[in-house]
Amino acid sequence: EFRDRRRMFFATFFAFLGAMYGIVFANNLVWLYFFWEITTLSSFLLIGYKETDESKTNAMRALSMNLMGGLGFALAIVLLGHAGIDNLADLRAQGAASQLVVAAAGLLAFAGIAKAAQFPFAGWLRGAMVAPTPVSALLHSSTMVKAGVYLVLRLSPNLEGTKVGMAVALVG
């Protein structure tokens, strides 16, 4: 048994869904990162919703894996800020023009791979099954995984023909 926290559950659930819309529609990297991390925090809260030891452990695992990806995302924003690039359209227009752009695209791809629960980050997704059924279905079937895949696809012009692109292709 656990205490009734349905209001928090649905508020977090809808924040998660809203953040997914933000990821799809954001062009600015800082806004994209903002929505990206809302999905991380929301998934942590939703996986740990039941407040059992198992759900808390799996929520922390999901949080740590996704925060590693978020760190890569933040580092990419810093690198791209030095190059004067602050949105995905400008990043894609650069292609693989410089090592800095390719490195930043690689860090963003790392974030996408972590969010998509690709090897070696797949461990958190299995543990997410302790969450209530709508959450585990949402995390497994569509949103978190597809958010990572979506970001990697948007970066494909920057990774094409590079060693980083080959590494991403091998992993994902």
Predicted ranges, named:
Residues 1-172:
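...captures the hydrophobic TM-helix bundle architecture rather than a specific catalytic motif
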